[in-house]
């Protein structure tokens, strides 16, 4: 039962990012990111990472609320463009949903996906098992697992934030 809950949450996670990537207006892009961030926190909490999920929810989504509140105020439109108002945007949204549906059907038929990585033992690295170590709390072990197993995730996230800052500086420069 828990596998299906994680599977449904993962599908909603990807659908939220499909909605974000085909955003026609900044308001709807923010909604897609907030939905995906909340569902991602639910996935983390499902793997008994309650502290990490709560911190991501409070810090990440709290910061996003401020940023998207500011961008929505700066980019207000009288009639914001929705997904169905532009054929190209709607086509990208439908194509993304179709690809996610194909992946879901493939996983339900085959049982696993091993395209670039093998995801069969996902519970082994999401949150460390700390039952044997009585001296460490789950929170400290969770943060250390982020920097040990999730090293490439931290590197990619840092690089993405750097590129985002450069893009924002170029856009605001106006040149």
From Swiss-Prot:
Core subunit of respiratory chain NADH dehydrogenase (Complex I) which is composed of 45 different subunits. It is an enzyme of class 7 (translocase). It is a multi-pass membrane protein. Core subunit of the mitochondrial membrane respiratory chain NADH dehydrogenase (Complex I) which catalyzes electron transfer from NADH through the respiratory chain, using ubiquinone as an electron acceptor. Essential for the catalytic activity and assembly of complex I. The chain crosses the membrane at residues 1-21, 27-47, 49-69, 88-108, 149-169. GO terms for molecular function: NADH dehydrogenase (ubiquinone) activity. This is NADH-ubiquinone oxidoreductase chain 6. Belongs to the complex I subunit 6 family. Keywords: Electron transport, Membrane, Mitochondrion, Mitochondrion inner membrane, NAD, Respiratory chain, Translocase, Transmembrane, Transmembrane helix, Transport. It comes from Pteropus scapulatus. The gene is MT-ND6. It catalyses: a ubiquinone + NADH + 5 H(+)(in) = a ubiquinol + NAD(+) + 4 H(+)(out). Its EC number is 7.1.1.2. One of its GO terms (cellular component) is mitochondrial inner membrane. Disulfide bonds: none annotated. GO terms for biological process: mitochondrial electron transport, NADH to ubiquinone; mitochondrial respiratory chain complex I assembly. The keyword Calcium does not apply. Its main location: mitochondrion. InterPro entries: ComplexI_Subunit6 (IPR050269), NADH_UbQ/plastoQ_OxRdtase_su6 (IPR001457), Nuo/plastoQ_OxRdtase_6_NuoJ (IPR042106). The lineage of its organism: Eukaryota, Metazoa, Chordata, Craniata, Vertebrata. It is found in: Mitochondrion inner membrane.
């Amino acid at each position: 039962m828990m596998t299906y809950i994680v599977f449904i949450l993962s599908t909603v996670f990807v659908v939220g990012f499909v909605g974000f990537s085909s955003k026609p207006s900044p308001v709807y892009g923010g909604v897609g990111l907030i939905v995906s961030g909340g569902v991602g926190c639910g996935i983390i909490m499902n793997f008994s990472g309650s502290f990490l999920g709560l911190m991501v929810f409070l810090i990440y989504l709290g910061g996003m609320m401020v940023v998207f509140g500011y961008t929505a105020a700066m980019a207000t439109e009288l009639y914001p463009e929705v997904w169905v108002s532009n054929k190209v945007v709607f086509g990208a949204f439908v194509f993304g949903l179709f690809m996610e549906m194909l992946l879901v059907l493939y996983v339900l038929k085959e049982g696993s996906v091993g395209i670039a990585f093998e995801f069969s033992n996902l519970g082994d690295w999401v949150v460390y098992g700390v039952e044997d170590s009585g001296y460490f709390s789950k929170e400290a072990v969770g943060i250390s697992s982020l920097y040990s197993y999730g090293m490439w995730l931290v590197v990619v996230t840092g690089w993405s934030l750097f590129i985002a800052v450069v893009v924002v500086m170029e856009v605001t420069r106006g040149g």
